[in-house]
């Protein structure tokens, strides 16, 4: 199989930065490489193998006619979810998850039909509509609300074959609904998450914009490859290069997990992160988005 993503790309996107050590789920211990300045560092060798596994699942699911629902409503994920899902023609939810979106899909589908009916109305043609300006205004507002909440799944005619989740803690309702319907969950697992909730986990940073964007792009690439296989095309692959790595980052790159307990040189240490509640920056990388 061609290289899906390199460890260098994961490092440069900050995928390895976990939460502060006091904010973790012990079930994530097996995915943790070491700790630096009170922050857990995720083992990217394991992330890489789990990415390959998730990639193959998504690719095969789509190749056999399946649909992947992209879900990420936190600020750091909204743009990536929107762009990547639209790039590969998949449904998405990036604003607000409505309870019952999966478990009560028959009702949701009726609202989608209502949205399509409203889209047929010419709100600027008052004369031929047979409605008053006030009535048209009310219908326009109804349409805008439906577009905002359901626009991303406008063309989804049945529940998806699988869901891609950014931040399993924030999207716990979506995960709960998917599990009730036995819909496979593919998701980023940060160090504070529960791996038992996810079928195809990707250990990584679910708060940094670059990390979320990279991993969501990888999932979208898997969808694209699956679509090409479905249509009989020949998929390609991408590779990346980067800057020199710090010593402790090279340990990750080389898979030296036995070095987890060793001290890094001052220049090699990751900068300490503050609690997200105390700072507007993301917990993991300078210049990233805010916590949703």
UniProtKB/Swiss-Prot annotation:
Membrane-spanning parts: none
Lineage top rank: taxon: Bacteria
UniProt keywords, alphabetically: Ribonucleoprotein, Ribosomal protein
GO cellular component: cytosolic small ribosomal subunit
Pfam families: Ribosomal_S2 (PF00318)
PROSITE patterns: RIBOSOMAL_S2_1 (PS00962)
Membrane in keyword set: no
Ranges of compositional bias, category Basic and acidic residues: 247-259, 271-292
Entry-linked InterPro entries: Ribosomal_uS2 (IPR001865), Ribosomal_uS2_bac/mit/plastid (IPR005706), Ribosomal_uS2_CS (IPR018130), Ribosomal_uS2_flav_dom_sf (IPR023591)
Entry keyword annotation includes Ribonucleoprotein: yes
GO MF term (any one): structural constituent of ribosome
Coiled coil regions, renumbered to chain: none
CDD domains the UniProt entry points to: RPS2
One GO term of the biological process aspect: translation
Annotated stretches, region: Disordered: 230-292
Family: Belongs to the universal ribosomal protein uS2 family.
Protein name: Small ribosomal subunit protein uS2
Organism: Thermobifida fusca (strain YX)
